[in-house]
UniProtKB/Swiss-Prot annotation:
Biased composition, class Polar residues, residue ranges: 216-228, 320-332
Glycosylation sites: N31, N90, N102, N149, N167, N217, N271, N288, N427, N503
Gene Ontology terms describing biological process: immune system process
Organism: Anopheles gambiae
Name the record gives this protein: Sporozoite-associated protein
Length: 539
């Protein structure tokens, strides 16, 4: 009730609680106390029962007779003095597992089977384990007054050894050593071999064959294809008995006259006239020269294609094709003053250029020029005017309309540049973002647009276009990932390019000597690897 009063004081502000709930709580507490009292009473009764049970068990242990040993065990012990006929009767009664406990053990069972015993030897008893010692029982007055009426067993004789041969090292062992277990060292160290080596012997003639394992006096048998060699135990024993049984024997296969290589007709020499049209370039590693001479020769080769024809316009064997090609190259030169290094890349590969240094200078060489239809079209560089330099955004839009190729934007000196300040109005940021997107689209390669469907800008037409004031900046799916970069460097590169940084600046911000980038460059194919212009061409 004290607890109930405390509860009432604690929850006094719950005025709407009815009195029935307190009556219910009181009944629950009374039931719990009654259960506790009954549990204590049951524990006391259980302890009394356990004490009575322990006393009864002690009394029963005093009265219980000791279990005598089984008659089979008794017969086993008495079989030491019994004759052989009694042993055989005992064996017939019992099972194999009780007689031979070690039957599953292969080593023990093999020795037991091979051991031939005398008829008087107690074989049956020797294979059995000794009887277990009886547990000491509590002394009782009855045991002292009247002893048990059990027949006394005769004292056991000491057990004889089952294998007495193991102790005597002079005698020959019961199990002979296997034929294949003999080691060469034992044979060499034996006294018989030493005696044989001392006696003078005539040298035996050894067979000439490299792999022959036959004896010298044995006749060489010719192989017969109609008769198969004997297989089975006979052949195995004959191989095992020989001294050189493990050496490989050379197989004599009869050579058939039809398939012999000596009788094959000589094929006519292959006609090489068809292959003379195609010249395969010799790799530079064939010539045994130093690396410095190789590099000099490669420099001569690169200059010879583009400039040698301009220096010698009047060569003896110069054809109309070479003169027209030199004229075409002279016309193109003023338009591209800085493209001299790029000229010999676009020329058709000439395999004869490598051997020009060995020939005399008086001879003229015919170098195949690339046809005009296959040459790359070059668009002259448009230098922006001063008006366009003033407004950078107009210049970027104008270049995007005029040309499709990648252009170089020439910026004025930093003193002439005007500081570009981005206004806070929404329209100025939209123009800046659109210019960035246009510049990134121009850098994109045409091949990546066709092959990669993910590069196509995605337009969601179902939702309709958003209003001009809420247009977000779309992520540049159209930006091509730079070649030779790993995944982490590519993500970092895209992060810098989306911020509006130029490609070169974004490249400079990437970590140097990245191991993953080097691995990616090793496993990537160069862009012009499968270009047919660089493959060997006919003369």
């Amino acid at each position: 009730m004290v607890n109930l009063c405390n509860l009432l004081l604690k929850y006094d502000h719950f005025s709407k609680v009815e009195d029935d709930i307190f009556i219910y709580i009181d009944r629950v507490l009374e039931n719990a106390s009654e259960i506790y009292v009954r549990q204590q009473k049951a524990k006391r009764e259980l302890e009394c029962l356990e004490d009575q049970l322990a006393e009864k068990q002690k009394q029963s242990n005093r009265c219980v007779l000791p279990v005598p040993r089984s008659p089979v065990k008794r017969r086993k012990v008495q079989s030491l003095d019994s004759p052989l006929s009694a042993q055989k009767e005992n064996v017939s009664i019992l099972e194999d597992s009780t007689i031979f406990p070690n039957k599953s053990d292969s080593d023990v069972s093999a020795k037991l089977e091979l051991n031939i015993l005398d008829s008087e030897e107690p074989f049956f008893a020797l294979t059995q384990s000794p009887p277990p010692a009886a547990a000491p029982q509590s002394p009782s007055p009855r045991a002292i007054l009247s002893p048990r009426n059990v027949s006394k067993t005769s004292p056991l004789r000491p057990m004889q050894l089952l294998f007495p041969e193991e102790n005597k090292s002079e005698k020959k062992p019961l199990l002979r050593e296997s034929r294949f277990g003999k080691s060469v060292k034992l044979l060499e160290s034996s006294s018989v071999v030493a005696e044989k080596s001392n006696t003078p012997t005539t040298p035996k003639t050894t067979p000439n064959g490299k792999w022959t394992g036959k004896n010298a006096n044995a006749t060489i048998e010719t192989s017969n294809t109609d008769h198969t060699p004997p297989s089975g135990l006979k052949r195995f024993l004959s191989l095992a008995d020989s001294n050189q049984r493990f050496r490989q024997v050379k197989l004599n296969f009869p050579r058939q006259t039809k398939q012999s290589p000596m009788n094959e007709p000589e094929h006519n020499s292959v006609n090489d006239t068809l292959f003379s049209d195609f010249v395969v370039p010799t790799p530079p590693s064939v010539a045994n020269k130093s690396k410095f001479l190789k590099s000099l020769r490669m420099k001569k080769q690169s200059t010879l294609i583009s400039r040698a024809q301009d220096d010698k316009p009047g060569t003896k064997g110069g054809s109309d094709e070479t003169s027209s090609s030199t004229a075409a190259s002279n016309e193109r030169q003023p338009m591209f003053p800085n493209d001299n290094d790029d000229d010999d890349i676009d020329q058709t590969y000439c395999p004869g250029v490598e051997s020009t240094s060995k020939l005399s200078k008086g001879l003229s060489f015919k170098i195949k020029q690339e046809p005009e239809s296959q040459q790359k079209e070059r668009i002259p560089l448009k230098v922006p005017s001063n008006k366009k330099l003033e407004c950078l955004s107009d210049h970027i839009l104008g270049v995007g309309e005029d040309s499709e190729s990648n252009e170089i934007i020439v910026l004025p000196a930093p003193s002439q540049q005007s500081v570009i300040s981005v206004a806070e109005s929404q329209n100025a940021t939209e123009i800046f973002i659109s210019e960035l997107n246009g510049e990134n689209a121009k850098r994109m390669d045409a091949v990546t647009i066709e092959t990669n469907p993910s590069n196509v800008p995605r337009v969601n037409r179902e939702l309709g276009e958003l209003s001009g004031s809420v247009k977000p900046y779309t992520r540049g799916y159209e930006q091509p990932s730079p070649q030779g970069l790993c995944i982490d460097c590519t993500m970092l590169y895209q992060y810098h390019t989306t911020r509006g940084v130029s490609n070169d600046t974004a490249r400079s911000k990437l970590p140097r000597n990245c191991r993953n980038c080097r691995v990616a460059q090793l496993h990537s194919t160069p862009p012009g690897f499968w270009d047919p212009d660089f493959l060997p061409t006919p003369e």
